[in-house]
C-alpha cells in the first residue's frame, strides 16, 4: 500500500526552533530563517516547504506569536519581524528597540515569551532584562491594529507565560514564581 509517511530536511543547516499554524500552513522557524510548510497530502508530494526569510531566525521557542494571519517574532539579532502569508518577511521599526537589545540578559533569549491581547490588537514580548536578573521582568509591546497601530510600549512586569482571552474571559499571565494574574480586567 502507498504511504504518505515522509521526512523533509530543511536545507541550509541550523536547527528548528519553533513552528506556528497560520491558516492551513505551518510557519517553521530555524535559528537562521523562516519557512512556510504547505500540506498537499499526495503520494510523492505530501508537504512543500518554501524559505520565505533569511537572517530572521527565531531567538527562542516562545518568541513568536500569530495574530490573525500575521506572525510576529524576535530574531536572533534582537530585531522584531512580521510575516503575513503570501508576503515577505518585514523588519518592524521600533524606536525603543535599543533599550531592549542592549539589556536583554545575555544567553537568555530562550526565555522570551511572545503573546497577544487580541481585543486591543497588541502583541507583546516578555523578556529577561539584565538590569533585573535572569528571569522575565520586562515587556515591550506593539499595537498592530486600531488607532494606535505602530505604537510601541514598554514596562516592568514579570511574566514567563501568557495566554490571550479565549480559554478564559481575560488574558492571563504567570510570574516565574507561578502566580497567575488576570490582565485587562
Question: What feature does the model see in each segment?
Answer:
Residues 2-11:
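A short helix->beta-strand "capping" segment at the edge of beta-propeller domains
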Residues 11-185:
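Beta-sheet-dominated scaffold domains
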